[in-house]
Design a protein with these regions (language model features):
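Core beta-strand elements of the Rossmann-like FAD/NAD(P) dinucleotide-binding domain
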Residues: 94-103, 223-232, 270-271
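FAD-binding beta-loop-beta segment adjacent to the flavin cofactor pocket
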Residues: 112, 252, 259-273, 326, ...
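General small-molecule cofactor/ligand-binding pocket signal
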Residues: 74-76, 127, 196-198, 275, ...
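FAD-site-proximal beta/loop scaffold in flavoenzymes
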Residues: 122-139, 227-305
Length: 425
């Protein structure tokens, strides 16, 4: 059961990973158009949106037919909600159907949080991370409300396309969950792209004045009020589990304070015959976590029942700014708060031969090593190809390798992965 014919394949394929990373790649190309006019950049951006749509529609169609063409699968496009613990009502465009099952899986994903800012509702110049990717005209001035990972990805992308980007972040520090040296390197690198950061920014209203938006915000430290004009405003203020219309109460399925479905390590809800997978259960909102959720349920239903959520930690993640930021495990601050005796290793990207050949020398590599065991506790890579290289570190950690395994491993040359030799030396 899927409520939208535009969402087969889920968030990743349609409005998340695939379209954004397609645009990130196109933006990387656009960043080389140094002497181009804004009109030329706008034309390139318009084509990039078309490329994105081609990629997503092809994958959406493939995912739909993988289901619809299977002899054991019936697909309903409609809105589902629980009638009881084992009955789901599906309202299609033409009828209401009741489906009964002893095993039900909830996979409704997450939705964008729209903050209660005056002037945001029904404002045609205000976008979410979903709707802005349908915008075919490159905004000359883009204001992004929120400096988290989603906000930074779009800031980096649109700055590369040629927009003047301002990020309004309510906190005094950028990406507070990262170490300050990593966050400082990210901020400095993005500022080189022309991105402006306004910290301690509390957005009060967004006005639609003629053909432009006027964002009114104050500095939460000083109280001073500012106005910014923009051609588009992006709300990057987080996502929340999509549970509000499911009528979970009648099914005996409980949620936490954030609306996420509560599950055990086998993904069973408070009703053991109903499971929840993906973003709707809270936690890390990554496609590869959803895929591993499937593996857990597969093993629970048809296998040895040994696979569980606690087996997969730590999990790596990447933020596709330019260059990418990737991380796995504990950072330095977290390790020290846990009173771990750690060794900290750092390597500036400018010291990496492959980075020099690419002409991309901004960034920083950092590793956290347990001094007593020699095991890698965590790793942060802000560098070209970081989203690929982090998987090497992840495999070393998951297989229990000593840090010397990466220090002495024979990598190809020149490559970004060989920087691990120097980082762990």
């Amino acid at each position: 059961v899927e409520r939208s014919d535009k969402m087969y394949g889920g968030t990743c394929i349609n409005i998340g990973c695939i379209p954004t990373k397609t645009l990130v790649h196109q933006a990387k190309i656009a960043s080389g158009m140094k002497d181009s006019t804004f009109e030329e950049r706008s034309a390139f951006y318009r084509n990039a949106i078309a490329v994105k749509e081609s990629v997503t529609s092809a994958l959406r169609g493939k995912n739909y037919h993988n289901l619809a063409d299977h002899p054991n699968v019936t697909v309903y496009t409609g809105v589902g909600s629980f009638v009881s613990a084992d009955v789901v009502s599906v309202r299609t465009s033409t009828e209401e159907i009741w489906l009964t099952s002893k095993q039900i899986i909830i996979n409704t994903g997450a939705e964008t949080i729209i903050p209660p800012i005056e002037g945001v509702a029904d404002n045609s110049l205000v976008y979410t991370s979903t709707s802005i990717m349908e915008l075919t005209d490159l905004p000359r001035r883009l204001v992004i409300v929120g400096g988290g990972y989603i906000g930074l990805e779009f800031a980096s992308m649109y700055a590369s396309f040629g927009s003047q980007v301002t990020v309004l972040e309510s906190y005094p520090e950028l990406i507070a969950r990262e170490d300050r040296d990593i966050a400082a390197s990210v901020k400095e690198t993005l500022e080189k792209k022309g991105i402006v950061f306004r910290m301690n920014a509390k957005v009060q209203s967004v006005k639609h004045v003629e053909n432009r938006a006027v964002v009114v915000f104050s500095d939460s430290q000083t109280g001073e009020v500012f106005e910014l004009e923009a051609d588009a405003v992006l709300l990057a203020t987080g996502r929340r589990p999509n549970t509000k219309d499911l009528n979970l109460e009648v099914a005996g399925v409980e949620t936490d304070a954030r609306g996420a479905i509560i599950v055990d390590e086998y993904l069973k809800t408070t009703n053991p015959n109903i499971r929840a997978v993906g973003d709707v259960k809270g936690g890390l909102q990554f496609t590869y976590i959803s895929l591993d959720d499937y593996r857990i349920i597969r093993e629970d239903l048809f296998g040895d029942k040994e696979r569980k959520t606690s087996d997969r930690n730590p999990v790596a993640y990447s933020v596709f700014i330019d260059p990418p930021l990737a991380r796995i495990g504990l950072n330095e601050d977290e390790a020290r708060k846990q009173n771990l005796d750690v060794i900290i290793k750092k390597l500036p990207v400018m010291a990496i031969p492959r980075a020099k050949t690419l002409g991309e020398t901004d960034g920083l590599l950092k590793a956290v090593i347990d001094k007593n065991t020699g095991k890698i506790v965590g790793c942060m890579l802000f560098a070209p190809d970081a989203s690929e290289v982090i998987n090497i570190v992840a495999m070393a950690m998951k297989t229990g390798q000593d840090y010397t395994f990466l220090r002495d491993f024979i990598f190809t040359h020149p490559s970004m992965s060989e920087a691990l030799n120097d980082l762990f030396s």
